[in-house]
Amino acid sequence: MKSWVIGNWKLNPTSLEQVQHLVTDLVEGVDAQTRSMDNCHLMLAPSFLHLSPVQQALNANSSTLKLAAQDVSALSAESGAYTGDVSAKQLKDMGVQWVIVGHSERRQYYKESNAVLLKKLLNSAEQGLGVILCIGESESDFEAGHTEQVLDEELQVIADFLQQLKPEQAGYAEQNLIIAYEPVWAIGTGKVPSVEQVTQIHRFIRQQLHSFDNKLDTTPVIYGGSVKPENAADFAASDQINGVLVGGAALQADSFLAIAKCFNN
């Protein structure tokens, strides 16, 4: 199974000029350093505003970098009177291939529930977009030993999603789903769980996916939370960690590519 290294730019950079410099550095870095990166998929998730210029830069350079959006509308897969939303169809038309759903920041600030996330999953599937579903526990839940309980509740959206897929969408989930385990207490804090802890949690996630449908046994399960070049090799050494969702380190081309190299080995 190929690894996935996904850069979530969040609300960065602040100017188009900075975006253009970053994507240029990434494309040139991939061309110069990682042409032989056969074991790793690379993906960028810029803000909605910067999807178009990033896609144009990738197309102009025939880059193998994939493009993801950081969110997608739950209200419509196509169009409608939903001010501020961006639909799966609009994203697909822009060249987006994947969407991030359920990031802890959206769960926290926008109070996104499993019911909302289910709609986003279904809308993405309707347009053939892949989904990176983020799950993770708070520090208090982690310290109380409630990690598995929280993850089980958050993963239930996958069970509901599978039940609501249309017959013609059979096979969608096993080809277009990535689970990103991001402990909330590790995101941007510098606190990092041990590789052993993440490995054990990923095994639990796989068990839950298998209980929903054994065809999900090959679903990539990746880790996110203060991933840096300094710790990437440790995570890459675990056979249960199929890649990483990178935040701050994705805003520097050298750092992002250094992480990618760890997962190409």
Swiss-Prot record:
Residues annotated to bind substrate: N8, W9, K10, G188, S226, G247, G248
Annotated localization:
Cytoplasm
Q: In which pathway does it act?
A: Carbohydrate biosynthesis; gluconeogenesis; Carbohydrate degradation; glycolysis; D-glyceraldehyde 3-phosphate from glycerone phosphate: step 1/1
Question: What family is it from?
Answer: Belongs to the triosephosphate isomerase family.
Q: Name one GO cellular component term.
A: cytosol
Underlying gene: tpiA
* A GO biological process held by the record: gluconeogenesis
Q: What species was this sequence derived from?
A: Psychrobacter sp. (strain PRwf-1)
Q: What is its EC number?
A: 5.3.1.1
PANTHER family the record matches: TRIOSEPHOSPHATE ISOMERASE
Quote the catalytic residue positions: H103, E182
Q: Which cystines does this chain contain?
A: none
What quaternary structure, including any partners, is listed in this protein's UniProt entry?
Homodimer.
Give the UniProt keywords, A-Z. Answer: Cytoplasm, Gluconeogenesis, Glycolysis, Isomerase
Q: State any single GO MF term.
A: triose-phosphate isomerase activity
Protein name per Swiss-Prot or TrEMBL: Triosephosphate isomerase
Described function: Involved in the gluconeogenesis. Catalyzes stereospecifically the conversion of dihydroxyacetone phosphate (DHAP) to D-glyceraldehyde-3-phosphate (G3P).
Q: Which InterPro entries match?
A: Aldolase_TIM, TIM_sf, TrioseP_Isoase_bac/euk, Triosephosphate_isomerase, Triosephosphate_isomerase_AS
Name the catalysed reactions.
D-glyceraldehyde 3-phosphate = dihydroxyacetone phosphate
Q: Name one Pfam family in it.
A: TIM
